[in-house]
Amino acid sequence: MKIRVRDHVKVAADRMARIGLSGTARTQLDLYCVAPGQSQSPHRHEGEDKIYYVIEGSGRFTVGDSGERLEAGDALVAPAGVGHGLVNDGSALLLVLVLVAPPPAHVKRGPAS
């Protein structure tokens, strides 16, 4: 099933927007829309791996004790049990595709489920 990612871009004034694009019993695909100055607070998933793939913009991503600047075309893996987060410290919108496997039990499946 084709997903036109650009059709799902939404920007919230007060916090990062997480849009569920698709999901199965084994994966969840989200789009994070992060305006300048917005962030995802550091957190961890004990049973799920997360892969970030930047499609537009740039930002500072942390996994464990290390931080990396990611730009469009870069990816980063946050293994299960390791703290991770991000901040858009730039001046443009940051768009990130996020794959979580398996999806956390509390996550609502996206529209393509």
What are these regions (language model features)?
Residues 39-41, 57-63:
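Short beta-strand segments in beta-sandwich/barrel cores
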Residues 29-33, 51, 75-77, 98:
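Conserved hydrophobic/aromatic beta-strand scaffold that supports enzyme active sites
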Residues 80-105:
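Ligand-binding loop in jelly-roll beta-barrel domains
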Residues 47-49, 53-59:
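Glycine- and acidic-residue-biased ligand/ion/polar-headgroup-sensing regions
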Residues 30-45:
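Conserved short histidine dyad/triad with adjacent acidic residue
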